[in-house]
């Protein structure tokens, strides 16, 4: 660690953000969407366990903890229940409203029942001048989002370091930075905010991948920890929390720690060998896999592809090898040039049907239906032969 060993550390933090509890995954089938939504609660236990494992002094939760300002009670009740189970007394937790769950008069943060359920060591950041004294001569400044969008930099509400102030100063806000192209900027955070406000660590939330902002400045650091569970296929480096060690010289060392169950992956298969290789993988059980198939194969290999799809996805009687599979098989086509040679055992009337369907498959408007019918006749021929 920078500046000495464990004895030199004066403050340890766990920084998390963007839980998005209550998020719905409408592009997935109902049972898959439920599994993904529930996993957003399950990851909280792994986050809190990581805090205990690293013996942190403070847990910072930097906004968008709920996917909307007024989530169903089942979400905020479970947050309170899972926090209460930790039985922490000397490890304060700070919950920051973000732009998805801003501090509004009717929001979850104003819900008296939710507040009463929370342990006394859990603090909601409910004012723009929030300040809290931390152990070992440290202080936290935090600024909540009070609307879904805004053009002001929330760090401007954090007081600058006064002459002679030697405390470890931590900031926590939720918003966008200017280092990502084509990203909608909401509650814009200046890249030099950690410097201009005299902070030793700036904990931020909003984007869903772990990164330093800017990437080449590690001291003092501004950090997005990322969403602890991914929410989309295009996210870069989601699934972590940031564990932060600050030494006597006020230098912060930041370590990402993975807590996610799911890894989201997109894959294209364009050959049977690609598909066979995918099916042999042993790491698919915790994958959310978007699989796109694009190939044209003869009937025996088409049949093999059907079997491999079933192995990946599962059936009503057995689990598939992939945790959650989003399969697009529109690009899988039956090679019809030699399909008649596989149907010689059929009665002549069905062989005549094969020839008609083969001709129909040349028409793009009829191709898909004709190919499925030809495959069915191939299966009939196989059964007859056996």
Located regions from the model:
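His/Asp/Glu-rich metal-coordinating catalytic cores
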Residues: 33, 58, 69-223, 227-232, ...
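A structural signal for the main folded, soluble domain(s) of proteins
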Residues: 2-10, 39-40, 45, 49, ...
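Short gly/pro-enriched beta-turn/loop segments at secondary-structure junctions
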Residues: 217, 236-239, 262, 284-286
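Short loop/turn motifs at secondary-structure junctions
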Residues: 10, 55, 167, 198, ...
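Conserved beta-strand elements of the Class I
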Residues: 14, 139-141, 242, 265
């Amino acid at each position: 660690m920078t500046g000495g060993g464990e004895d030199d550390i004066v403050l340890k933090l766990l920084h998390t953000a963007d839980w998005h509890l209550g998020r719905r995954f409408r592009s997935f089938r109902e049972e898959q969407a439920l599994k993904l939504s529930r996993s957003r609660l399950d990851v909280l236990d792994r986050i809190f366990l990581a805090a205990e494992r690293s013996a942190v002094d403070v847990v910072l939760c930097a906004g968008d903890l709920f996917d909307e300002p007024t989530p169903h009670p089942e979400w905020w009740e479970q947050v309170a229940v899972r926090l209460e189970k930790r039985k922490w007394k000397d490890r304060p937790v700070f919950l920051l409203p973000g732009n998805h769950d801003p501090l509004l008069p009717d929001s979850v943060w104003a819900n008296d029942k939710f507040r009463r359920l929370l342990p006394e060591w859990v603090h909601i950041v409910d004012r723009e001048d929030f300040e809290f004294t931390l152990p070992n001569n440290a202080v936290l400044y935090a600024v909540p989002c009070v609307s879904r969008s805004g053009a002001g930099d929330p760090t401007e509400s954090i007081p600058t370091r006064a002459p002679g102030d030697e405390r470890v100063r931590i900031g926590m806000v939720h918003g966008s930075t200017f280092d990502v192209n084509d990203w909608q900027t909401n509650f814009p955070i200046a890249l030099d905010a950690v410097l201009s406000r005299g902070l030793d660590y700036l904990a931020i939330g909003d984007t869903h991948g772990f990164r330093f902002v800017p990437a080449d400045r590690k001291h003092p650091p501004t950090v997005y920890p990322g969403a602890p569970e991914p929410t989309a296929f295009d996210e870069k480096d989601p699934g972590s929390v940031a564990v932060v060690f600050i030494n006597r010289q006020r230098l912060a060392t930041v370590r990402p720690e993975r807590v996610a169950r799911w890894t989201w992956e997109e894959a294209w298969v364009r050959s049977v060998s690609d598909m066979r290789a995918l099916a042999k993988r042993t790491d698919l059980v915790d994958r959310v896999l978007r699989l796109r198939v694009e190939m044209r194969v003869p009937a025996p290999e088409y049949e093999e592809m059907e079997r491999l799809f079933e192995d990946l996805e599962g059936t009503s009687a057995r689990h598939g090898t992939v945790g959650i599979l989003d399969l697009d098989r529109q690009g899988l086509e039956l090679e019809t040039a030699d399909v008649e040679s596989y149907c010689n055992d059929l009665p002549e009337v069905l062989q005549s049907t094969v020839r008609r369907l083969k001709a129909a498959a040349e028409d793009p408007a009829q191709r898909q239906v004709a190919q499925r019918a030809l495959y069915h006749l191939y299966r009939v021929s196989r059964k007859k032969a056996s």
